[in-house]
Amino acid sequence: MKTYWQNITNRDNIDRGLYIILPLRYQGFFQSITIDEKDTEFPKLTFDSSDFTELLSVKCRNGNFVKRFSINSRLKETVEAWNGKVAASKEYQLDDLQFFIFNNGIAFITIYLSYQNKDAEKMYQFINPGYVQDKSEDINQIQDALLNSLEEKVFGCIQEKLGVTLSWFTQDEKSKRYIIKEAYRLNIASLPKRFEDNEIPKRIAYNGHRLVDLTRDFRDASEEDVEYATGAKDVDDEHYGWGCAITSQEISYAYGPGPWKSKPRDKKGLRERSEDDLLLTMIVMYQKYTCMIFNEKIHQRFTSEERRLKGEASLRDLKREALEFISYGTLAPSQISRWNNVCETYRSLQKQNGVNEALEEISQKITLLNEEQDRIDGERESRVSMIITAFGLISIIAAALQTLDYISTGNSLMIAGFLVTCVAMILFFLALRFDEIRRRRKQKDR
């Protein structure tokens, strides 16, 4: 680390940025969302990456899986509302707003805060990673004001333009205060030069994850769940171009200049460089929150009396949705990208966000749903059998009464026929019984 930073001046001015990915629910029809290609208020952005396989690119480009929009037309109004509510928010620079909407009721707003290395402490105070309670009430007010400004300036506009009603992905109003705290983050930094050793970008990316000065030699032995990925070494200049640290709270990238480039990326170039990594992260966020929705639906199915009364139809629909998501909504790492390091980054993102564990849990709960389906089918068959038995008993009683009516006439031929029939039936059932006993004895002798 010390060798890397030798002869580097203006370390305080290293450009950094932070995407905060805010989860949402929406009500409305995904397929009915249409925006004119020339619309300047809500321009549609392409959800595609050169890192993706063609299979994934086609799925994302056709608009049936995800749609992406720039909502920077509301950026100025949102910032003004934020600053008007809390003056201390002027310390933070909000540079970009995007809206991602998926086809299953989940959506995201990404807010991008740009800052420099010298402002790392300020950003650390804003996020306060690793702590439930913030160090000051001012930070809570800044966060609440940001969320309220988005509700006022963005939510209504999205409803008007896209026809969907948004709400935060929370259980109740009280948990709204934890939205920013629990939101996944993408942290990025533009480094002044490329890396001779791939341990260097890992260390710098870890500092980015902890929201501290990138030049610090910072270590934390207690954080054992961090995973890393780096770009391949360039065969010409024999240097590495990037590295990332992946945790359950965020993914942090350290980008060096391009091959044979001596100048770091500027603010605009930094955001452009992070474009592919943002889209990769969004795919995992879609999987994470979809798993949460299915677990929620399954829980409600077994606890809500109203849903229980809906019975077989709702259960069948829930199973179908869950199986479709497991079959088509998720992709193995090898199907994500043609590049091994991107596949490994995706694999680590899935692992750290608990996607694979959640999928396994959903699969186990589908087994419970199958048992519930069998129980419902058994109850229905029992009801049908009871109805058939009841009609059978009624028929037998009616036949017996009719027979007694015939016998009561005193006709000797009728009485004799009835007795012969009864004796024949008794002999028939005795013969069946003796035959069954004989077969059992033969089986025992063998």
Give the ranges of each region predicted by the language model.
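Intrinsic-disorder/low-complexity, polar/charged segments
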Residues: 117-128, 135, 303, 307-314, ...
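Short Lys/Arg-enriched alpha/beta "domain-start" segment
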Residues: 1-241
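Aromatic-enriched hydrophobic runs in primary sequence
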Residues: 144, 155-157, 163, 172-175, ...
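Membrane-proximal, solvent-exposed terminal domains/tails of membrane-associated proteins
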Residues: 184, 189-339
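Alpha-helical transmembrane anchor segments
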Residues: 385-446
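Membrane-associated alpha-helical segments
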Residues: 282-402
